[in-house]
Design a protein with these regions (language model features):
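Bacterial N-terminal signal peptides
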Residues: 14-22
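Classical eukaryotic N-terminal signal peptides for Sec-dependent ER targeting/secretion
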Residues: 9-11
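Short, positively charged and aromatic/hydrophobic N-terminal segments
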Residues: 4-7
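Hydrophobic membrane-targeting alpha-helices
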Residues: 23-28
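Folded, non-transmembrane soluble domains that reside on the lumenal/extracytoplasmic side of membranes
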Residues: 29-187
Length: 187
């Protein structure tokens, strides 16, 4: 009887320790916002993906940076992509707006800036085009790109492809007029 009781106590202790570690990790997870996300493009003009937690592989981050760099050089669109675990208040829309306002993403005259925020553990994202892009990149196109590139790849657990395919689709949109993705099926 005492041996069974001792094993149960060990199992209960192990379960309690496991649950405590999960809650501790969640409590210490950083809530990212426009103030504490390092803006890599301010230190290196060839970098556009803000990935302070190193969620993406270096090679895929470089490939994504290359597409965004081409977007700026060929179409005059400055873009900032952010990928983090959590954003403040679970609100990527607010974080994207705050980044655009705080750092002035895009040319001041044309307002052709773009901020994309992906918060993996919050399971949320937002594509925020500047006012100067809204005629060229509609809300419907932003939603199609987000669902086909970000949501689809995040469901597969592939943040690298979520960011790279988004950069490719947006680059294609401004280079050819088409995103190169099929519009997601309704329903």
């Amino acid at each position: 009887f005492f041996a069974i009781f001792a094993r149960m106590n060990k199992a209960i202790f192990a379960l309690c320790a496991f649950l405590f570690s999960i809650f501790t990790l969640q409590a210490t997870a950083k809530d990212w916002n426009a103030v504490n996300i390092p803006m890599v493009h301010l230190q290196d003009a060839r970098r556009y993906v803000c990935d302070p937690e190193n969620i993406m592989s270096a090679a895929m981050r470089d490939a994504t940076d290359a597409y965004i760099g081409r977007l700026e050089k060929e179409a005059g669109i400055q873009a900032v992509f952010v990928i983090v675990s959590h954003v403040e208040n679970g609100d990527p829309f607010r974080v994207a707006q705050d980044i655009g306002n705080k750092y002035g993403v895009g040319n001041k005259k044309t307002d052709r800036g773009l901020v994309i925020v992906v918060a993996i553990d919050d399971r949320k994202y937002f594509i925020a085009p500047g006012d100067g892009l809204e005629g060229d990149l509609t809300d419907v196109e932003c939603d199609d790109i987000a669902r086909s590139c970000i949501a689809k790849n995040m469901r597969k657990g592939n943040p690298d492809m979520a960011m790279l395919s988004t950069a490719k689709a947006i680059y294609n949109k401004f280079k050819t007029g088409e995103t190169g993705i099929e519009s997601p099926k309704e329903g």
